[in-house]
Structure formats: structure tokens, C-alpha cells
């Protein structure tokens, strides 16, 4: 979803946050997500803040299964230590503390996912296999 916003606006996520603020970014994010309504057979990767709005959570569920990929704070800190495109992770607060704060704030919304997968110490193949097992179980009516 972020990549779609960058393409549509011609600006990076950092530029959008700096020039317009988080509220306007979230408005743009919601509008872009709404454009996908009715889409089928689509895999959509969103930023972690998309779930902050009820309308977005509802639309995500209408589009299909919602998969929440998570990891421990230590693992997320390691993965994001060099990230330059995460405006909410920059600033004075230590990265691990900021990640912890965001997870606490957002966890109730992440819990709304159809499946949550802890990706800590898992390979990409392991995670994909878990998602496919979930999907196959849903299609077979097992889950």
C-alpha cells in the first residue's frame, strides 16, 4: 500500500509525513485502500498503521483474509535498525522503545487479523507455508 502511495504522489513516505503530517498521510492511505474495494486474488502489504482506522480494518477483511506478521521487539529492532523510510521510528526515543510503544498501541487492532504469525527465527519459506496452510484450511472448511 505504501508503494502505491509513493507511486501516486511521487513522494516518499518520509516526504509525505514531513510535508503533510501523519493525519493527512492516514487520509491518503485510507483513500488508496478504498480504491481496492472489490479487488480479488490480491496480496496486499500494508504499513502497520493502516489498522488504526475502523474503516480500513473493515475493508481489509472485505478484501480477504488478514494476516498479521509479527516478531519480538528485539527482532523488529534488528530488522529496522537501518530503515530510513519509517518516519514513526525516527526521533529521540530509542528504536526498541518506540517499537514497543507502537506494538502496545496497535496490538488490539492487530489482534483482529484472521491469523497472526510470529516470524521471529522463521525463514520466508516457513512463513509462506503457514499462510498457505491457513488458506488451504479455510478453503477446505477446516478452520
Language model features: what each stretch is:
Residues 55-58, 78-81, 129-130:
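Short amphipathic alpha-helical segments
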Residues 2-61, 85-87, 109:
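ATP-dependent small-molecule kinase phosphotransfer cores
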